[in-house]
Regions:
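Canonical P-loop GTPase G-domain recognition
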Residues: 30-40, 174-223
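Glycine- and Gly-Pro-enriched alpha-helical subdomains that act as flexible
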Residues: 115-118, 141
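Conserved C-terminal guanine-recognition region of P-loop GTPase G domains, centered on the G4
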Residues: 124-194
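Flexible beta-alpha connector loops of hexameric P-loop NTPases
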Residues: 106-116, 172-175
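Conserved G1/Walker A P-loop phosphate-binding module
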Residues: 7, 12-108
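Extreme N-terminal basic, low-complexity initiation segments
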Residues: 2-6
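Residue-level signal for inorganic ion chemistry
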Residues: 92, 169, 210
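Conserved alpha-helical scaffold flanking the Walker A/P-loop in AAA+ ATPase domains
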Residues: 88-91, 121-129
C-alpha cells in the first residue's frame, strides 16, 4: 500500500514538473541554450528523443546571426565573413528535453564535391529520419531568396510532412515595400504551404514572430 502511494506521488511530481516546463516562456527557454555536440556523421547523433527544431540555410544567409539573436548571445553560433563555416550538425541544448540544431550551410561553391555530397547526405538523413524533429526553420537572405538549394530543401521538408517556417533575414537592408514583395514571392513559389516572415538580427525585427513559431513547436508558452 505504501509503495503504491509513493508511486502515485512520484507520478504526480513528474507531471507537475512537466507542466512547469510547458508553462515556461519560449524566451526563457532559448536563453538557456548551451553548445552540446557537433555531429559529422550519423553514428554520432544523440538519442532520438525529446523535441528538436532545426535551422537550415545557404552559407552566409545569416543563419548563425539569427541563432545568436534568438538566444540573446553574441557568439553562441559562430559567425564568419567566410561562407561554409558550419560544417556539421551543431546541437544546442535548451533544457533536458529540447534542442536547437544548426545544420551545415549549403550552396558554398568552394567546397569540394565529395564534402558537399557528405553534407547533403547528412542533412537529408537527419531531416528524413529524425523522430524528435518538430519543425524546420529555413533561412534565406531577403535580397537573394530562392537560390539553388533553397526550393529543393523546402520541397524535401514539405514532402516529408515537416512543419516549415521560412525566415527572410537581413530585412533591415530593404524598405518595407521591398520586404513585402520578397515575402509574397517566396510564399507564392511554395504555394502558400509554409509560413514566411522577415527578420533582422541587427534590429530585432521579426524576433517575436519567430519566438511564437518556436513556442508552438517546442510546446511551451510564447512570450
Amino acid at each position: 500500500m505504501i509503495s503504491e502511494i509513493d508511486g502515485a506521488e512520484s507520478d504526480i511530481i513528474a507531471r507537475l514538473r512537466q507542466l512547469k516546463k510547458t508553462m515556461t516562456p519560449i524566451r526563457h527557454i532559448v536563453e538557456q541554450a548551451e553548445y552540446t555536440l557537433s555531429v559529422h556523421n550519423r553514428s554520432q547523433l544523440p538519442p532520438d528523443a525529446g523535441i528538436e527544431v532545426a535551422v537550415a540555410g545557404r552559407s552566409n544567409s545569416g543563419k548563425s546571426s539569427l541563432i545568436n539573436r534568438l538566444c540573446r548571445r553574441k557568439a553562441l553560433a559562430r559567425t564568419s565573413r567566410t561562407p561554409g563555416r558550419t560544417q556539421q550538425l551543431v546541437f544546442f541544448q535548451l533544457d533536458d528535453e529540447r534542442s536547437l540544431v544548426d545544420l551545415p550551410g549549403y550552396g558554398y561553391a568552394k567546397v569540394g564535391a565529395e564534402l558537399r555530397k557528405h553534407w547533403e547526405g547528412l542533412i537529408q538523413n537527419y531531416l528524413e529520419s529524425r523522430a524528435a524533429l518538430a519543425g524546420l526553420v529555413q533561412v534565406m537572405d531577403i535580397r537573394h531568396p530562392l537560390k539553388d538549394g533553397d526550393i529543393q530543401l523546402a520541397e524535401f521538408a514539405l514532402h516529408r510532412g515537416l512543419p516549415l517556417h521560412l525566415v527572410l533575414t537581413k530585412a533591415d537592408k530593404l524598405g518595407h515595400g521591398k520586404r513585402m514583395e520578397a515575402v509574397h514571392k517566396v510564399r507564392s513559389a511554395l504555394g502558400g504551404v509554409a509560413t514566411v516572415q522577415v527578420f533582422s538580427a541587427t534590429t530585432g525585427l521579426g524576433l517575436e514572430e519567430l519566438e511564437h513559431v518556436l513556442a508552438a513547436w517546442f510546446q511551451v508558452m510564447p512570450g
